[in-house]
Amino acid sequence: MGNDKRVRKPEWLKISIGANERYTETKRIVESHCLHTICSSGRCPNMGECWGKGTATFMIAGDICTRSCKFCNTQTGRPLPLDPDEPAHVAESIALMKLSHAVITSVDRDDLPDLGAAHWAQTIREIKRLNPETTTEVLIPDFQGRKELIDQVIKACPEIISHNMETVKRISPQVRSAANYHTSLEVIRQIAESGITAKSGIMVGLGETPAEVEELMDDLISVGCKILTIGQYLQPTHKHFPVAAYITPEQFAVYKETGLKKGFEQVESAPLVRSSYHAEKHIRFNNK
């Protein structure tokens, strides 16, 4: 995967992390409870903004993934056993942060018989038990398309369930380890058919065309997806899939307009958008 012709990062992608008291307090709570966040492990460009507002996306089931997607910075390897205290720790941290809306994601745990589904469900239930006024959004793996495992998450009743398509159909096999485009669509269909709001996210700048992005939008609409996030792919290290192009803010605006015209209820589309960016706005809109 040579990357001799690196694309220069444009000015609109240069950000300042910045820190305020809320950022420092959020960081303290996360570290004191030995929690993992996708904010830090995924090197999210919005960490300063989100932590500064007292929000964070918690990553459960450890911080070592059994898959090795070519776009992702999360560590790959043999994960440790699940921590039975983690659901309680996450719920307690949400209470300490006084979050009105919590976002949870996880690594893939293909090493476990149930792929981590029971741990997922227990975490959601514990959050709701300790924080009855807090709404939850969960960004789940594909659970290898096993409907009975996805049902465990659905039955825990989060307000929004998200599963990321990540990229267009043509590029998906090149960058998604052990994942399948059509399996992901079926995961989203199952979520939507349950009555829970279905959400998905994609990256652009991997070499896709606008026509392919529109095709992906059509596929998502056809299975009942209501919320879509679109952000610029940023290559974590030289070993990862190279950036093919930096998409302009103007093109992101076009994608947003196109998505809304196609029938999505909400579209977040901008260079620094990530899956959980402005998630608190999505739940407020969803509850109207």
UniProtKB/Swiss-Prot annotation:
Organism: Bacteroides fragilis (strain YCH46)
Record family assignment: Belongs to the radical SAM superfamily. Lipoyl synthase family.
This protein's name: Lipoyl synthase
EC number: 2.8.1.8
Entries under InterPro entries matching the protein: Aldolase_TIM, Elp3/MiaA/NifB-like_rSAM, Lipoyl_synth, rSAM
Subcellular location, principal: cytoplasm
The Radical SAM core domain, residue ranges: 51-265
The keyword Iron belongs to this UniProt entry's keyword annotation: yes
Catalytic activity: [[Fe-S] cluster scaffold protein carrying a second [4Fe-4S](2+) cluster] + N(6)-octanoyl-L-lysyl-[protein] + 2 oxidized [2Fe-2S]-[ferredoxin] + 2 S-adenosyl-L-methionine + 4 H(+) = [[Fe-S] cluster scaffold protein] + N(6)-[(R)-dihydrolipoyl]-L-lysyl-[protein] + 4 Fe(3+) + 2 hydrogen sulfide + 2 5'-deoxyadenosine + 2 L-methionine + 2 reduced [2Fe-2S]-[ferredoxin]
Binding site for [4Fe-4S] cluster 2: C65, C69, C72
